Structures are given as C-alpha cells and as structure tokens.
C-alpha cells in the first residue's frame, strides 16, 4: 500500500520538478522584462499574436508570456505571482486541475493561462459558481488583461442578446456555469444565425472545479415550455374525429396501420375548424392533433395496445403482454388517447432542450480547473474529463493543527461540547468558523449560542446575499461564524492583525459524506502559512456513523460507563468514518458515471440534430437536402406497401392514396402504372413526378421567397419533432427501470429503444417536411417562428436540496405573442381572451 502511495506521490513530484524548470526559465526572463516601459509591455501582446500567425505555438510563448503577465500584475494589481502560482498556471494551460490550497491565490494564478490562451483570439471562458464571483474577478483581474490590450467581457443572466454577443466576442469572458450551458442550449433553438451569442467552445478554466464538475454533475440544465396550449386542441380534435366515418372521411390500412384523412375528411375538418386550407403552415399544430386523434381512435385499441389504470393510460408491451408503466407514446399520441378515454390529459411542462454540465464542458477543445480539494476525486476527473489533478505545493509550509475527531455518545452531548468549545475560544478572542452539513444544525447551534450570549453570524443558503461581507468579517478578533458546507467558497477569510499569532479555529459539527467537503472546511484555517486549528465533533447518532453500524461502538461506550460529556478519541473510529466516506464517494461516482452513460445516448442524438440545424441556418439553398428527404419518404412508403411475398397482396391502392393525400395531386400517379413495376422500380417515376411538382412551385414565386419558405418548413418540423422526442426520451428514461423483464440491462434497453425512437423521429421529420413542401400554400409574409418559446427561471437556493434538482427554465406567453394553438392570432385575441 505504501509502495502504491509513493508511486502516486512520485508522479506528482515528477510533474512539479518538470514545471520547476519552466518556472526557472520565466524567472530568468525577468531581468529583460522588468526594464520595459508600460507601452513596451503592452506592445508584447501584439508581438505574441504576430508570432502565433507565423507558426509559433502557445506552448512556445509560455515562458515569455507568463513573465509579461507577472510584471503587469505587479504594476497593475500590486501582486507578484509566486513560483508556485506560475506552476499552477502551467498545469492549467496543459488542461489539468491545479489543486491549490485555500488562500494560495488561485484567481491571480488563472490570469497567466487566460492571457496566454486568449492570444489566439478564439476566446477563453473563466467559469465561476455564482455571478458575484464572476463580476468580482472580471473587474479585478480584468484591469490586468485590459492593461495588456485584451478585451474582457462578463456574461450575466440579466443581459440582452446584444450584450451577451459582445461579452462572448471578447478575448476573455467571465461567466457562471449555468449561464454558459443555457446560452449553448438557446443558441441551438434560434432561427437566424445572427441570433447566436456563443463562439465555438475553445478553452475554459473552471474555478471551484470540483463543485461544478462533481457536485453539480447530476444537475441537468433544462429549458422548458408549457405544453398546456395543446390540451384544448386534443379535446377539439378528439370531438371532431368522433364525427368521422370510415372509408368516407378517412382510410385505414390494416397491414401498415396507416390511417389518413380522405379529401372528404379534409373538407370536413376545414369546415369544422373554420379554416381555408388544413395544410397551411399556420395549422401545423391542428393537423398534427387531428392525425393523432385519428390514430388514437382507429389504430389504438383499449385492453390490446393499452389499459386504463387508476385514471392513467398504461402501454401494453405487444410482445410480452406486460404493462410498461412510466412509458408514454411520443408525438402527442399518448395525450390523444387520454382525450379519447376521458382521463386527465397529462401535459406537464415540455422539455425543449437539456444538457448536463458533464456533457457541456466536455465539448471544449481544452478544459482545466482550480480548487483546493480535488485529489480525492482524481479518478473521476481523469476518466470522465481526461484531466489530471496536480497538487501544487504551498508557498509557505502549512502549520495548521488538524486534531483527531472527538466522538460523543449522543447528538446532545456533541452539541453541548461544540458550544462550550466556541464559548471558550470566543473569550480568548480567537475567531471561530463552525461548519455544519444542514441548515437546521446551523440554526440549532445559533440558538444555543444566543442563550450563552455569544454574538455570531449565520451563513447558509437562506442569507447568501450577505455572503461576502460575513466571510470578510469571519477572521476578526472574537468573530463567530456558522456556515453550511458550500457557503462562502471563493471568498477568503483574512485574519485580523491582532490575532495573527493565534489563527482561525475551524470546528466541524459532523463529517460530511465526502472527504472533499471536510477538507474544504479544514482548508479555511491556516492559509498562507498562518497558524490555525481544526477539530471535528462526531456523535454515534450522526447519519454517517449510523450508516456503517456504530451499534458495537455505542455498546462499548455503555459498557465502559462513559457518559455524554466524555468524548473518545479513537483511531479505529476515525478509520471507520473514512472508509464509510470512501464507500459513499464510490457510490456517488458510480451514479454520476451511470448518468453519463444514459446522457450519452441523448448527447449523440443532440449533436446530430444541432449540427443539422446549424447547416440549415447557414445554408443558402435547402432544395437538395429536401429532395433527399422526399426520396427517403417515397422509398419507405413503397417498401411499406409492398412488403408481402406475393404480388397480389401488395397494397398499391393504399400507396397511391398515401401519395395523393400527402405528396402529389390526384391523378399524378396511377395504380395500373405502378402495378407493372417491381418495388425497386416504383420509386423512380414517383420521385420524378415530385420534382416536376417542385419545379412548378418554384415558378410561382421569387427564388428568395421559396428558399425562405423551405427554411420555415424545416425549422418548424425539426423543432416540433425534436422537442417531442426529448419528452419521449424523458419518459423512456423514467420508465426503463420499472420494467421487470428479469435479466435485462436497463442501460442497453434504453440505448436500443432510444436509437429506434430517434430513427423513427428522423423518418417522421422527412415525411412531414416533404408533405408541407408539396402541399402547403405559401403566404407572402413568411416568418420563422419558435415552436414553443423557452423562458428562464433560475433555481432558488433555499436549502441544500435545491442542489440536485434540475435547473429549469420555464415558459410564458406574452399577450401580444402569437397564440400557441396554431390559429395565427395574437394570444390576447385567441385563447387569452378575458385572461
């Protein structure tokens, strides 16, 4: 074991030795950089940029660029980076994690690789956990970068699109992780390329990297829109479909399970809904709802395809006959069945776009991070993000006294001892920071201290607005501060001059399930070689102690006759606590790894759709792409109607009906002509006819209008289908674990079904685009429209629970926005009348 530890430590030592040589090169350059005037120092930036264009790399420039930043920092900020900070900067530049203890100057360290990588002009993102830190770092470190001639932007939630574009166009952009993720999602929902705000993701440095990539890794970012608008449409469509007659108003092909309105049915719909043309782009939503209602009534049968159970529609697996709880049909079919059966239509908010931090940050060309505590999660950083953790030595040796845990029999005994310790230290004037895991604990200790007459500050999620002020006072003589585990990160506790020789006392009221969080709390004391003391108080009733079965320990304390006021200091218990923490950390890592495997399925699909959207947005002419879609649609239709072995069983009439209803005019394709051809020969004359019709359509309007019409159709269909697909994948994901198939791996099942659903969505997109291009009437005032508008609601941080909930952005309809029922009227004149 010791051998392995040595080996691990040696790897880190080797890295430090290697970087020490580069630090010596930087030091050697100081004599030539120091005499430069401010103007000459600023001129170095242009010189570096020119050298990059001539073929030098950022690695070649590193020693000189770091020397320039060091000199500029001394002049502008009055701070000169130490050798260990230069090492931290090198580790960051190489795409690794610099583990630097609290107070070692991580923010200043980051300026070195930020400057070097910003010289490429591709943009560098500095990522922080909250907007306060982003604004603080942008204004403080921004002075240094601007002095050297680089532009600095800050990206805040409250900014307009134009302000965001300006922030991202800067050489260096300071932002929170949430805002970066949401901007990426929003950029992939826009309809014009000019509306995008982000540039390609080049290099990011994440401050408090463990908090963002580990603690928040399981928090998905979600942009959602209310799908309520559909509920009424499902009801109307359901009522309308009940009036239709088979054969007359719709045709149903039993073999292919294909159902569609006939000419009579289309006319009936236009009359019923008081519209001129059902295939008009304005009525996309209405047509979709009618088609799904038709399928619900004609194709789907109660107690065969689904059952009604406790007011819900539950799908029946066609192969095994089992109920597939938690699974829902996609594309609104499930809601249509709910309308048919008269149960509540579940139309909760619809996910328009989603991504996890794991997948967002893995898209950067180069990623690095800084934190005081990362070594315990090194395996995760290496396996998931391909980053090594490099422990940077401290500038001055750590002289902090980390005392062994004190274990009490009950919580009451523990808290009494904690308060007594605080009171004694307070009397001596020593500042005390009390770390708690839960808000309730911090409030309990606060009450006990108030009874003892000790003035103190509480820092938890309920009052994070005063966070920086409270932390700034925490190192003053006699200060007592109670903080929940994550509160106050990123802000240093500086000691008052009169207590420099005593230092800060950190008291932990219980061990957290992660050693990393305990280490963060310890790291609050003894910064930059200051004295300090840390002490954890545990009880046999703590959650972690209960987890690994401390009954034997409790029994031993009882046998020894130990009362509640007597703690034990036991290496055995401390070791047991540590092994329990390792087990919990292992479980959490497995959970995050599993989440990533599931999320990877959606990631691959998301990349395909977003790439295609980007191509559509940038393309001048989509005709070639659309013709390809028509070809696939026709080939699928032919294959579907001619799949039987015997020619007599082919459904050529059904094929002609399908083509006439969806793509061509009556009489364009004749049944007898197709009967003379083999299935592989049928597609060609049909496609030729389609292209002929396409050409006719082109002649009816200016080319520019035709090209815009194509884009309108493609965006409308792709965005509608994709949001429905995300929703369906959500339901599949929730329901996959409920399937009691026995020896089936749910992940494999999810991958296979998810892929099949994606393929079916692509086919559906191609068919619908082909139908609208061929059948829709083209209006003069064409406009691209968002299918559903996604709005942002940031999570409130009231309590630690908020951490694990998805960060959701919701949707609202403005009174002057177009109504979402598809009528084309403003909301206030349609469904919003009287609201």
UniProtKB/Swiss-Prot annotation:
Residues the record lists as binding ATP: 85, 103-107, 492
Chief location: membrane
Record localization: Cell membrane; Cytoplasm
GO MF annotations, alphabetized: ATP binding; metal ion binding; protein-exporting ATPase activity
InterPro entries assigned: Helicase_ATP-bd, Helicase_C-like, P-loop_NTPase, SEC_C_motif, SecA, SecA_CS, SecA_DEAD, SecA_motor_DEAD
Binding positions for Zn(2+) per the UniProt entry: 819, 821, 830-831
Obligatory cofactor(s): Zn(2+)
Cellular component GO terms held in the UniProt record: cell envelope Sec protein transport complex; cytosol; plasma membrane
Function, as annotated: Part of the Sec protein translocase complex. Interacts with the SecYEG preprotein conducting channel. Has a central role in coupling the hydrolysis of ATP to the transfer of proteins into and across the cell membrane, serving as an ATP-driven molecular motor driving the stepwise translocation of polypeptide chains across the membrane.
The protein's name: Protein translocase subunit SecA 1
Gene: secA1
């Amino acid at each position: 074991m010791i051998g392995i530890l040595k080996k691990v430590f040696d790897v880190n030592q080797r890295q430090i030795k290697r970087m020490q040589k580069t630090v010596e090169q930087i030091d050697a350059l100081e004599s030539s950089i120091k005499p430069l005037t401010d103007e000459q120092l600023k001129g170095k930036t242009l010189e570096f940029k020119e050298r990059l264009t001539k073929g030098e790399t950022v690695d070649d420039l590193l020693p000189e660029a770091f020397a320039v930043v060091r000199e500029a920092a001394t002049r502008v900020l009055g701070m000169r980076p130490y050798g260990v900070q230069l090492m931290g900067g090198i580790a960051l530049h190489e795409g690794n994690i610099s583990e630097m203890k609290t107070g070692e100057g991580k923010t200043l360290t980051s300026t070195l690789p930020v400057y070097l990588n910003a010289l490429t002009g591709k943009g560098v993102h500095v990522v922080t956990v909250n907007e306060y830190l982003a604004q603080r770092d942008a204004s403080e470190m921004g002075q240094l970068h601007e002095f050297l001639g680089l532009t600095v932007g800050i990206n805040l939630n409250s900014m307009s699109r134009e302000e965001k574009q300006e922030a991202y166009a800067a050489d260096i952009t300071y932002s929170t992780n949430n805002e970066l993720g949401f901007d990426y999602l929003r950029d992939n929902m826009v309809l014009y390329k000019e509306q995008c705000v982000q540039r390609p993701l080049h290099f990011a440095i994440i401050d408090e990297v463990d908090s963002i990539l580990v603690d928040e890794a399981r928090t998905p970012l979600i942009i959602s829109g209310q799908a309520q608008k559909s509920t009424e449409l499902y009801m109307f469509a359901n009522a309308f479909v009940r009036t239709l007659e088979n054969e007359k108003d719709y045709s149903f092909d039993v073999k292919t399970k294909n159902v569609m309105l006939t000419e009579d049915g289309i006319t009936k719909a236009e009359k019923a809904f008081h519209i001129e043309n059902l295939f008009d782009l304005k009525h996309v939503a209405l047509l979709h709802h009618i088609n799904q209602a038709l399928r619900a009534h004609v194709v789907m049968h109660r107690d065969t395809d689904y059952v009604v159970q406790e007011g819900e529609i539950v799908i029946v697996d066609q192969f095994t006959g089992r109920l597939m709880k938690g699974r829902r049909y996609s594309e609104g079919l499930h809601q249509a069945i709910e309308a048919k059966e008269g149960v509540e239509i579940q139309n909760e908010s619809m996910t328009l776009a989603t991504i996890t931090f794991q997948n967002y940050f893995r898209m950067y060309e180069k990623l690095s991070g800084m934190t005081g505590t990362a070594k315990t999660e090194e395996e995760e950083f290496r396996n998931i993000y391909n980053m090594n953790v490099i422990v940077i030595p401290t500038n001055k040796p750590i002289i902090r006294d980390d005392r062994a845990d004190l274990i009490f029999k009950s919580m009451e005994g523990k808290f009494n001892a904690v308060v007594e310790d605080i009171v004694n230290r307070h009397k001596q004037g020593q500042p005390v920071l009390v770390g708690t895991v839960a808000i309730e604990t911090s409030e309990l200790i606060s009450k006990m201290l108030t009874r003892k007459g000790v003035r103190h500050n509480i820092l938890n999620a309920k009052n994070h607005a005063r966070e920086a002020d409270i932390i700034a006072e925490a190192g003053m003589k006699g200060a007592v501060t109670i903080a929940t585990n994550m509160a106050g990160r990123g802000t240093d506790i500086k000691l008052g001059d009169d207590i420099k020789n005593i230092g800060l006392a950190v008291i932990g009221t219980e061990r957290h399930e992660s050693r990393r969080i305990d280490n963060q709390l310890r790291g609050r004391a003894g910064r930059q070689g200051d004295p300090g003391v840390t002490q954890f108080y545990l009880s046999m009733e703590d959650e972690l102690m209960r987890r690994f079965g401390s009954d034997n320990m409790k029994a031993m304390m009882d046998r020894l006759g130990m009362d509640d006021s007597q703690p034990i200091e036991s290496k055995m218990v401390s070791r047991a606590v540590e092994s329990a923490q390792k087990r919990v950390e292992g479980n959490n890592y497995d959970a995050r790894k599993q989440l990533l495997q599931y999320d990877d399925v959606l990631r691959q699909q998301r990349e395909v759709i977003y790439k295609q959207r980007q191509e559509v947005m940038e393309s001048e002419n989509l005709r070639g792409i659309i013709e390809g879609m028509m070809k696939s649609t026709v080939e699928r239709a032919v294959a579907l109607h001619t799949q039987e072995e015997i020619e007599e069983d082919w459904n050529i009439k059904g094929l002609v009906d399908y083509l006439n209803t969806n793509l061509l005019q009556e009489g364009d394709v004749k049944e007898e002509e197709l009967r003379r051809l083999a299935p592989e020969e049928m597609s060609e004359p049909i496609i030729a006819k389609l292209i002929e019709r396409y050409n006719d359509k082109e002649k009816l309007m200016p080319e520019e209008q035709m090209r815009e019409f194509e884009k309108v159709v493609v965006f409308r269909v792709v965005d509608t289908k994709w949001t429905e697909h995300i929703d369906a994948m959500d339901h599949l994901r929730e329901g996959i674990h409920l399937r009691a198939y026995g020896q089936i791996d749910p992940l494999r099942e999810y991958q296979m079904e998810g892929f099949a659903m994606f393929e079916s969505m692509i086919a559906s997109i191609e068919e619908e685009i082909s139908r609208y291009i061929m059948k829709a009437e083209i209006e003069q005032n064409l406009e691209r429209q968002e299918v559903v508008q996604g709005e942002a609601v940031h999570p409130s941080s009231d309590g630690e629970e908020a951490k694990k909930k998805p960060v959701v952005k919701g949707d609202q309809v403005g009174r002057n926005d177009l109504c979402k029922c598809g009528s084309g009227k403003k909301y206030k004149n349609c469904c919003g009348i009287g609201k």
